[in-house]
Structure formats: structure tokens, C-alpha cells
From Swiss-Prot:
Function: Plays a key role in early steps of protein N-linked glycosylation by being involved in the conversion of polyprenol into dolichol. Acts as a polyprenal reductase that mediates the reduction of polyprenal into dolichal in a NADP-dependent mechanism. Dolichols are required for the synthesis of dolichol-linked monosaccharides and the oligosaccharide precursor used for N-glycosylation. Also able to convert testosterone (T) into 5-alpha-dihydrotestosterone (DHT).
Membrane topology of this protein: Multi-pass membrane protein
Domain of life where this protein originates: Eukaryota
Name the UniProt record assigns to this protein: Polyprenal reductase
Gene3D superfamilies the UniProt entry points to: 1.20.120.1630
UniProtKB keywords: Endoplasmic reticulum, Lipid metabolism, Membrane, NADP, Oxidoreductase, Transmembrane, Transmembrane helix
This protein's GO CC annotations: endoplasmic reticulum; endoplasmic reticulum membrane
Organism: Ailuropoda melanoleuca
Gene coding for it: SRD5A3
MF terms in GO: 3-oxo-5-alpha-steroid 4-dehydrogenase (NADP+) activity; oxidoreductase activity, acting on the CH-CH group of donors, NAD or NADP as acceptor; polyprenal reductase activity
Cellular localization per UniProt: Endoplasmic reticulum membrane
UniProt keyword Lipid metabolism present: yes
Length: 318
């Protein structure tokens, strides 16, 4: 472990503790799914909680008590509406603070202090946090566009707990980014307002990685959407088919892989050394790996001719 990471792990603030807990929870869940069937007692409620969309049990195999908590999967758009509004709001305040010297509202910098924003900020650059917040906002806008104009949602569902977590997730993510901004002792004014003088090589690299990952994720969502449309772009069914093209040639869920790469691009933009964001990346890795693994199992069980060389999440590895 890098010395800077080891030193910072000894002083977990609330945000780091939260992301570490989430990452550990999803790691444990993934490991439980990797255990061969029959070695551990099954739990329908647990399985229903961790699955969504096509990977949920269909028909009468799901207990009635589980179906009570169903929410349409098309409500995914709500996550990105909240994210676009909230992170746009945070970006507006950060822009005002950086360029106009306007302090954050009292309630906002008070909340950031509670989350631990006043700790470990000596080595951060304001430009890094500004760019990452821009990336997060643009990512939310693109995903919102895809929900309305690219994706074709069937009548599949998600659990109400997953829905509520999704609503909170991007609020928490935006606050995590903002908490990395170097500020004065009162956590009200941004330190280092001359952003152009802060530009580093890793900002360029992070931006290129973000664009590259976003383009591939968009392509994958277009491929998935087109499986349910005719050549004129009209939706003709909501069945599942085997996707081909782009990163689908390597993994079953390249959209999840691209999501991970997007968050890694943000870690690069932070200069590689931001422990808080690497904990976010760790959570994203295990949560997306879990979803990809369940999706991979679905494809393999449904299609006899499913390509055997495809992995679930990481090309050639997993």
C-alpha cells in the first residue's frame, strides 16, 4: 500500500467510512454469489434485494411479499434528474466561489464540515474537484438523455430500497466531490482560485479517459436499445437478445465496465492520490461487478448459443 494511503486510512472521516462500508458490503455480496449453489442456505428476500431488471426472478417464483416492494425499472431516470439538478446546484456554488469569491451557504459548508471536508485538504487542487464535478454533472445529463431517447425499458422492476439508494447516491457523490475542494479553516472559501495555473498533465489524461469511457458507454446503450427497435428506430418488442459490437465482444456488461472507467478517470483527474475518491471507485467496482456477474448468469442461462469467450465484467479475467 502506498505510504500516503496507509497514513490516511488511520484517520477515516465520515465520508471515507461510509464509502468503505458500502464497498465492503458489495464485496461480501459478490463473494456470496460466487459460492457454488447449495453450499449456503438460500434467502429469497436477500436475492430479491440485490437483483434488478432482467436478473430478478420472474412470475410466481418470487414471493408475493417481494413483489410488494417493486418499482418500475424505467424510474432509473429519476436518479439522473435528481443528479443533474443537485450536482448542477453544487457546480453553480463552486463556480461562484472559485471565480467570484462568493462563500458557500452556511448550511452547505456546515454539512461539508460534518462530512469531514476540513480534513486532509492540503494537497488538493481546486481545479481537480471542479473538473470532476463537471464530469459528474455531464455524466448525469447524458444518462438522463439515454433514459428518455436511447434505452428501451421493459416491464422489469427494481426494489424500493434500490430505488431510494439510487436517489441518495448521486447526492452523496456530489457532496463527496465538493468535500475535496481545498478550503479555508471555516470551510467557506475555496483556496487557489487561479484555476488555469493549477493545470497538470493528469487533468488532461483524466479528461481524455472520461470522454473515451463515456463514448463507449453511450455506444453500448445504443446497441442495447437497438435490440428492441427496427431499422426505422421504432420499438417493436421488449424481449432480450444477445448484444454484439463494441465492448460486447469481450464482456456481457460493457456499460458497467465503462461506468467503472468513468469513475477511474475522475480518480486520475484528482491526481491519483485522493483516497476518498479511490474508496468511491472501490465501491463502484464491486457494485458494478455484482450486477455484471448476475447479468452474465442470466445471458448464459437464457441463450444456449451465448458466446463462450465473453467474460462478465473484466475482459479475459472475470
Amino acid at each position: 500500500m502506498a505510504p500516503w494511503a496507509a497514513a490516511q486510512l488511520w484517520a477515516l472521516n465520515p465520508l471515507r467510512a461510509l464509502w468503505l462500508t458500502l464497498a465492503a458490503a458489495f464485496l461480501l455480496t459478490l463473494l456470496l454469489q460466487l459460492v457454488p449453489p447449495g453450499l449456503l442456505p438460500g434467502c429469497a428476500l436477500f436475492q430479491d434485494l440485490i437483483r434488478y431488471g432482467k436478473t430478478k426472478r420472474e412470475g410466481q417464483s418470487r414471493p408475493a411479499v417481494c413483489r410488494v416492494f417493486d418499482v418500475p425499472k424505467r424510474y432509473f431516470s429519476h436518479f439522473y434528474i435528481i443528479s443533474a439538478l443537485w450536482n448542477g446546484f453544487l457546480l453553480w456554488h463552486l463556480t461562484q466561489s472559485v471565480f467570484l469569491g462568493v462563500p458557500f451557504p452556511n448550511w452547505l459548508h456546515g454539512l461539508l464540515r460534518i462530512l469531514g471536508a476540513s480534513q486532509f485538504q492540503g494537497g488538493e487542487l481546486a481545479l481537480s474537484a471542479f473538473l470532476v464535478l463537471v464530469f459528474l454533472w455531464l455524466h448525469s445529463l447524458r444518462r438522463l438523455f439515454e433514459c428518455f431517447y436511447v434505452s428501451v425499458f421493459s416491464n422489469t422492476v427494481i426494489h424500493i430500497v434500490q430505488y431510494c439508494f439510487g436517489l441518495v447516491y448521486y447526492v452523496l457523490t456530489g457532496l463527496t466531490v465538493l468535500s475535496q475542494v481545498p478550503m479555508d479553516g471555516r470551510n467557506a472559501y475555496v483556496i487557489g482560485k487561479n484555476l488555469l495555473m493549477q493545470a497538470r498533465w493528469f487533468h488532461i489524461l483524466g479528461m481524455l479517459m472520461f470522454i473515451w469511457s463515456s463514448v463507449h458507454q453511450y455506444k453500448c446503450h445504443v446497441i442495447l436499445g437497438n435490440l428492441r427497435k427496427n431499422k426505422a428506430g421504432v420499438v417493436i418488442h421488449c424481449n432480450h437478445r444477445i448484444p454484439f459490437g463494441d465492448w460486447f465482444e469481450y464482456v456481457s456488461s460493457p456499460n458497467y465496465l465503462a461506468e467503472l472507467m468513468i469513475y477511474i478517470s475522475m480518480a486520475v483527474t484528482f491526481g491519483f492520490h485522493n483516497l476518498t475518491w479511490w474508496l468511491v471507485v472501490t465501491y463502484v467496482f464491486f457494485s458494478q461487478a455484482l450486477s455484471a456477474f448476475l447479468s452474465h448468469k442470466f445471458y448464459k442461462s437464457k441463450f444456449v448459443s451465448y458466446p463462450k469467450h465473453r467474460k462478465a465484467f473484466l475482459p479475459f479475467l472475470f
